[in-house]
């Protein structure tokens, strides 16, 4: 049986850590929807449309992955797409309590929505979008941390 799962985030910017989780999820599940959150409470480096396009470009090599922008409740989005589960990357103990609360809330809101936690590969365990933005803002080289599409988009912003 083939399952649809959702990997959601703001992806501002998408990192190689995100891509690692997506690639591994694509091997485990029939379809992976990368849900790019609009999140109006944040001041993003990239617009909603840019983030969605960059995720789409970064995942183009994965036939069973699609990028979709969304706003509103993730539980509602999951229902609309008949997803069986959410995939969440979990870097360490700092993430666990928050992620478990989020998983329980999404399950309650949807009626039944499991969450699958995937630890990142050791190479990317320390990496976050926040760190990439900080390196970028201080004119550091982020090439090793982001997919090529994101790197090109960052260079265009300079």
Curated annotation (Swiss-Prot):
Its main location: cytoplasm. ATP binds at residues 10-11, 18, 89-91, 99, 124-130. It is an enzyme of class 2 (transferase). InterPro entries: Cyt_trans-like, PPAT, Rossmann-like_a/b/a_fold. Keywords: ATP-binding, Coenzyme A biosynthesis, Cytoplasm, Magnesium, Nucleotide-binding, Nucleotidyltransferase, Transferase. Substrate binds at residues 10, 42, 74, 88. Homohexamer. Belongs to the bacterial CoaD family. Reversibly transfers an adenylyl group from ATP to 4'-phosphopantetheine, yielding dephospho-CoA (dPCoA) and pyrophosphate. This is Phosphopantetheine adenylyltransferase. It comes from Actinobacillus pleuropneumoniae serotype 5b (strain L20).
């Amino acid at each position: 049986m083939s399952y649809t799962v959702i990997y959601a985030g703001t992806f501002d910017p998408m990192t190689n850590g995100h891509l690692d989780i997506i690639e591994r999820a694509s091997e485990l599940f029939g379809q992976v929807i990368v849900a790019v959150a609009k999140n109006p409470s944040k001041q993003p480096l990239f617009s909603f449309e840019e983030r969605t396009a960059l995720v789409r470009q970064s995942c183009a090599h994965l036939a069973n992955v699609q990028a979709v922008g969304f706003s509103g409740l993730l539980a509602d989005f999951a229902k609309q797409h008949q997803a069986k589960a959410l995939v969440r990357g979990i870097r360490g103990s700092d993430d666990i309590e928050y992620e478990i609360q989020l998983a329980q809330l999404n399950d309650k809101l949807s009626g039944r929505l499991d969450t699958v936690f995937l630890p990142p590969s050791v190479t990317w365990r320390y990496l976050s979008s926040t760190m990439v933005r900080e390196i970028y803002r201080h004119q550091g080289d982020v090439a090793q941390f982001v997919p090529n599409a994101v790197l090109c988009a960052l260079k265009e912003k300079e």
